[in-house]
From Swiss-Prot:
Organism (species): Rhodococcus erythropolis (strain PR4 / NBRC 100887)
PANTHER family tied to this protein: 1-(5-PHOSPHORIBOSYL)-5-[(5-PHOSPHORIBOSYLAMINO)METHYLIDENEAMINO] IMIDAZOLE-4-CARBOXAMIDE ISOMERASE
The encoding gene: hisA
Listed EC numbers: 5.3.1.16
Family: Belongs to the HisA/HisF family.
Biological process annotations from GO: L-histidine biosynthetic process; L-tryptophan biosynthetic process
Name the UniProt record assigns to this protein: 1-(5-phosphoribosyl)-5-[(5-phosphoribosylamino)methylideneamino] imidazole-4-carboxamide isomerase
NCBIfam families with a match to the protein in the record: hisA-trpF
Gene3D superfamilies: Aldolase class I (3.20.20.70)
GO CC, alphabetical: cytoplasm
Amino acid sequence: MSLVLLPAVDVVNGEAVRLVQGEAGSETGYGSPRDAALAWQNDGAEWVHLVDLDAAFGRGSNSELLAGVIGDLTVKVELSGGIRDDASLEAALATGCARVNLGTAAIEDPEWCARALAKYGDKIAVGLDVRLVDGQYRTRGRGWVTDGGDLWETLARLDRDGCTRYVVTDVSKDGTLTGPNLELLSQVCAVTDAHVVASGGVSTIEDLLAISSLVDQGVEGAIVGKALYAGRFTLPEALAAVSG
């Protein structure tokens, strides 16, 4: 099975942006989210990773805009950002996206997350935003600002609750073009049977091939953002490289 690539469209105040290490205020603008998403679709993407960063940081919402973008696409969409309760979850699923990503809520509200997983199954992925703190992998919430506890304890709980897919981001790598954290991905795959989607740090085709080498361990896909926008490689080049 070949690695699935998910080009990212991160949205702030109606514009497609990229952050550096997930920090508000570090945005670089790239224009219309609709144009960005359609460009990835035209380049051969099977998935688009669409993120409402205003909702993720708790400072607003681009939900109507993103619902419109999803309606204009024929490819599958993974929708993320600010999905924290029944109303926001149902609104997200009603856009027609193929699946949603839960982030902060999976850390802060385990009971609600467990109910959501039981009800919607593999339409839900859980985003695990991770930072190495004093030699220990810790999860992060609220737009990567708050500590969410030990990664391995969090994973064990989510596995028990029936999570089938994790989107794993090393926050120290995201938006930096410094290469993915292959060790972290491998360690996560070793302790869960769920699918793993890698996020953060991809800067070269070689990085994607390195992630591709973990497919047999359980890595299903990779989210690619800044490297594409910065022109490090094109999506068709990346798709060709990992399809081998």
